[in-house]
Amino acid sequence: MRELDEHALAMPQTTKDVSDDGRPSYVVHGKLFCCHRSRRRDAVDTQTGERLDDVLMFRVADLGVKELLLADDRGVFFTTPHFDGYPAVLMRIPDLAWIDRDELRDMVVEAWLTRAQKRVAKTWLQEHAERES
């Protein structure tokens, strides 16, 4: 979770909101792009039936990207009926171990890009394209 926090807060104009029970949400211009979800009846442990307490939500660019992530062989990403037709994927915190630091950063950046103002996103992309070339 520390790396998620670092990556999210490195994005321009991002703020971190923390719920009363300590769950972080990352927001850019009032728009949520990633969060630690509270227990919900739509996300339950398949073995115990208990509501999951360790679910992260990441926005994605579109439903095509969502489908690609859901088809990932590692089985890290999932969804629930609540998110049908919505460009977001879910992931359990223990499954962060299955993705490396760069992939997590990319997930956060892509989520942020879906919610950031176009001007801010364009500037960020230009700055980072120059650094990598």
Feature annotation, model-predicted:
Residues 1-133:
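Charge-dense, helix-prone N-terminal extensions
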